[in-house]
């Protein structure tokens, strides 16, 4: 890497003054970091066109306080070509990361997973759901969410594909005779462990689990990207 340059992506932008922006970036070496982009709202600012989501960037910043100033931003390559549902899925991933990542805590492995996720969304739009579920599981692991999908938390026995297990937060999966929103088939748990979402029922179960697991991190405020996605999906299906 070029000295003093940092690889990163825009997660979120918001107005700071009449001429400037506060920008949340996800960077390889510093994780999520918020930078002041002075003058970025001016019509002829070189930053205006550069600070866009899904564009791999090279960044420089300065400052010693909590809020540092962006001094340079250049595209490292072309913006990833997101289309409709993939675009909203990318916004969803960005919004979740902006909420759950601790400020200036490095997640180098998750950064690589993010890059892979964005690339796959751009090139494999027919696989949006498996791509999102894979990244959500990778993100939970990076956050330290240590659930063992292959072992019963109560007995230590291996998970049986044919049995039902109930999810208990901060504990794991326990064999259960009940069937409700918190229970999962053993075969699905074993697929979660391998990030194998090729089965439609497993894919649906994975979405149910990640919503449960992410809820403590996301809080009660609804995700704006999810609302947008839900609004655009019916129109997309009608037009298709």
From Swiss-Prot:
**Its gene?**
recO
Pfam families from the xrefs?
A: RecO_C, RecO_N
GO terms, biological process: DNA recombination; double-strand break repair
**InterPro entries in the record, alphabetically?**
ARFGAP/RecO, DNA_rep/recomb_RecO_N, NA-bd_OB-fold, RecO, RecO_C
Q: Which UniProt keywords apply?
A: DNA damage, DNA recombination, DNA repair
What organism does the UniProt record list as the source?
Actinobacillus pleuropneumoniae serotype 3 (strain JL03)
Q: Per the record, GO CC terms? A: bacterial nucleoid
Q: What is the lineage of its organism?
A: Bacteria, Pseudomonadati, Pseudomonadota, Gammaproteobacteria, Pasteurellales
Can you say what this protein is called? DNA repair protein RecO
Q: List the disulfide bonds.
A: none
Which superkingdom does the taxonomy of this entry point to? Bacteria
Q: Quick check: keyword Transcription in the entry? A: no
Xref: Gene3D superfamilies: Nucleic acid-binding proteins, Recombination protein O, C-terminal domain
Question: So what does this one do?
Answer: Involved in DNA repair and RecF pathway recombination.
Q: Does the keyword DNA repair apply?
A: yes
Give the similarity note.
Answer: Belongs to the RecO family.
């Amino acid at each position: 890497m070029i000295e003093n340059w940092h690889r990163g992506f825009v997660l979120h932008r918001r107005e700071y003054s009449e001429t400037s922006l506060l920008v949340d970036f996800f960077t390889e070496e510093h994780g999520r970091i918020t930078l002041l982009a002075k003058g970025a709202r001016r019509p002829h600012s070189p930053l205006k066109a550069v600070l866009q989501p899904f564009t791999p960037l090279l960044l420089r910043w300065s400052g010693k306080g909590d809020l540092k100033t962006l001094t340079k931003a250049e595209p490292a390559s072309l913006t990833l070509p997101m289309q409709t549902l993939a675009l909203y899925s990318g916004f969803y991933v960005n919004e979740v990361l902006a909420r759950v990542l601790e400020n200036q805590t490095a997640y180098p492995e998750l950064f690589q997973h993010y890059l892979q996720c964005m690339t796959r969304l751009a090139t494999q739009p027919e696989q949006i759901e498996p791509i999102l579920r894979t990244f959500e599981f990778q993100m939970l692991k990076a956050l330290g969410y240590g659930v063992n999908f292959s072992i019963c938390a109560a007995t230590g026995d291996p998970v049986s594909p044919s049995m039902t297990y109930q999810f208990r937060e901060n504990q794991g999966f326990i064999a259960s005779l009940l069937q409700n929103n918190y229970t999962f088939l053993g075969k699905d748990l074993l697929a979660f462990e391998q990030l194998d979402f090729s089965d439609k029922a497993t894919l649906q179960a994975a979405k149910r689990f990640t919503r449960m697991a992410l809820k403590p991190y996301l809080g009660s405020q609804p995700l704006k990207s999810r609302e947008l996605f839900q609004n655009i999906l019916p129109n997309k299906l009608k037009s298709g």
